[in-house]
C-alpha cells in the first residue's frame, strides 16, 4: 500500500508526532527519550524563541492507516543569512525500515523547502545548535545522552540509498576521570593563570550567577562558536529563555567561570550528571512517577557514575593558550568528590582540532546534505 504523507495541523497530530519516537524505541536499551512537555514547547512558536528567525512544518507518514514515520522541516533564516545559503533542514526524523517511507518523508520536506525558495536539504538538524543534531553511524551499543540523537543502524543506510552525502562529522568522547590532576595539567593551569592574570569564579546561588554572568555566558557562546559549522547566533530572546531554563537546575559545583583582571568572562565550563537513566525510567513523562527519577538526580544529588559535559566555551583570543586546563583543574576535584567515574562530551565537529586532542574517540554522528530539494527518487 502506498505511503501517505500528512502535514501536522492540530495539537492531536503534534502529540502523535512526538509519541511516535517513544513507540519506535520503547524496547531499545540505548535510546534516551525526550521529555514530552519539552518537545511540545520546542515545537511551539509561542514557547520556542527560535521561531523569531525560524519557520517549521511537521509531517507524519501513514501506511495502512498507521503512523510509520515522522519528520520536521525547518528553515533557519539567520543561519542561511550567516552562511549565505538557501537550506531547508530536516530534523526529528524517525521511520520504520522501509525505504519508501524515508523517501516520502524527505521528499515532503524537500518540496516544502523548494516552495520557500530553498535549493538544498540538510540534516538531521534542529532549530539551532541547542537542539540535537546529526545521525548516529557508529556506537549503536552505547547509551545515548539527553543532548544526542539515537537512531537505528538502518537510518544512515537509507540516507545513502536516497543519494544523500556526508556534509559533516560529529564525534563524541568518553573521558575517564583521573584519580589526581596530572602534574603537567596543573603546571599549565598555574602558568596560564599567572601569565594572563585570570581568576576562577564559583557560585552557590543560581539567581546570583544568572544576574551577574547569565547574559555573558551565552554571549561568550555566540563569540566562541561563531566559526563552527552551521552555527547561528543566539537571539536575546533565546538567551533569556536558556538562562531561565538551564541555570536554575545545574549543580553549581559543576559550573566554573574564568574571568580576567576586570572580571570579564574569558571561559566557562558547565557539566551536569547524566540524566540518561532517569529519562529512560521516566519514559518521556513527568507523571505519574517520572518526576521522581529526575528529582533524585537534579535535586537530591543521587548521581550516576557518568556526567555530561554540556558546555565548554573560551573567548577566541584565549583559545589554544591552555585556558581549558584552568577550567578542568577546578572541575576534576569536584567530579572526584561527587563520585563520577567518567564524562561524556556532547557531539563535537570532527574537524574542530581545538578540542579533539583532549578526548578519547567514542562514537560518531553524521550530517547529510543533498544538493537540491527535488524528487528524492532521482539518484545523484
Set out the residue ranges of the language-model regions:
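A conserved beta-strand-loop-helix scaffold within acyl/acetyltransferase catalytic domains
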Residues: 24-58, 63, 73-81, 216-310
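Flexible loop/turn segments at secondary-structure boundaries
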Residues: 14, 77-80, 129-131, 180, ...
Amino acid at each position: 500500500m502506498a505511503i501517505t504523507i500528512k502535514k501536522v495541523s492540530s495539537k492531536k497530530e503534534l502529540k502523535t508526532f512526538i509519541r511516535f519516537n517513544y513507540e519506535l524505541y520503547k524496547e531499545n536499551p540505548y535510546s534516551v527519550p525526550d521529555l514530552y512537555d519539552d518537545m511540545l514547547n520546542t515545537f511551539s512558536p509561542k514557547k520556542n524563541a527560535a521561531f523569531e528567525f525560524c519557520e517549521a512544518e511537521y509531517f507524519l507518514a501513514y501506511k495502512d492507516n498507521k503512523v510509520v514515520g515522522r519528520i520536521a522541516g525547518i528553515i533557519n533564516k539567520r543561519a542561511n543569512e550567516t552562511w549565505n545559503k538557501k537550506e531547508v533542514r530536516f530534523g526529528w526524523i524517525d521511520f520504520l525500515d522501509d525505504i519508501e517511507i524515508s523517501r516520502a518523508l524527505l521528499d515532503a520536506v524537500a518540496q516544502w523547502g523548494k516552495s520557500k525558495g530553498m535549493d538544498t536539504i540538510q540534516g538531521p538538524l534542529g532549530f539551532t545548535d541547542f537542539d540535537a543534531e546529526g545521525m548516529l553511524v557508529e556506537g549503536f551499543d552505547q547509551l545515548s545522552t539527553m543532548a544526542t540523537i539515537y537512531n537505528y543502524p538502518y537510518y544512515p543506510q537509507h540516507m545513502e540509498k536516497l543519494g544523500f552525502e556526508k556534509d559533516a562529522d560529529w564525534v563524541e568522547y568518553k573521558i575517564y576521570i583521573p584519580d589526581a590532576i596530572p602534574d603537567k595539567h596543573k603546571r599549565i593551569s598555574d602558568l596560564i593563570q599567572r601569565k594572563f592574570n585570570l581568576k576562577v569564579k564559583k557560585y552557590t546561588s543560581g539567581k546570583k550567577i544568572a544576574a551577574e554572568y547569565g547574559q555573558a555566558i551565552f554571549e561568550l557562546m555566540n563569540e566562541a562558536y561563531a566559526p563552527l559549522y552551521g552555527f547561528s547566533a543566539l537571539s536575546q530572546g533565546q538567551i533569556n529563555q536558556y538562562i531561565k531554563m538551564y541555570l536554575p537546575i545545574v549543580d553549581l559545583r559543576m559550573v566554573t567561570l574564568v574571568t580576567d583582571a576586570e572580571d570579564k568572562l574569558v571561559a566557562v565550563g558547565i557539566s551536569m550528571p547524566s540524566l540518561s537513566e532517569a529519562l529512560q525510567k521516566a519514559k518521556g513523562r513527568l507523571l505519574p512517577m517520572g518526576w521522581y527519577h529526575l528529582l533524585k538526580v537534579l535535586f537530591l544529588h543521587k548521581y550516576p557514575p557518568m556526567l555530561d559535559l554540556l558546555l565548554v566555551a573560551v573567548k577566541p583570543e584565549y583559545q589554544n593558550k591552555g585556558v581549558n586546563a584552568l577550567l578542568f583543574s577546578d572541575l576534576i576535584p569536584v567530579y572526584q568528590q561527587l563520585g563520577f567515574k567518567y564524562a561524556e562530551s556532547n557531539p563535537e565537529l570532527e574537524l574542530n582540532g581545538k578540542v579533539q586532542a583532549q578526548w578519547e574517540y567514542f562514537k560518531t554522528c553524521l550530517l547529510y546534505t543533498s544538493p537540491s530539494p527535488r524528487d528524492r527518487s532521482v539518484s545523484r
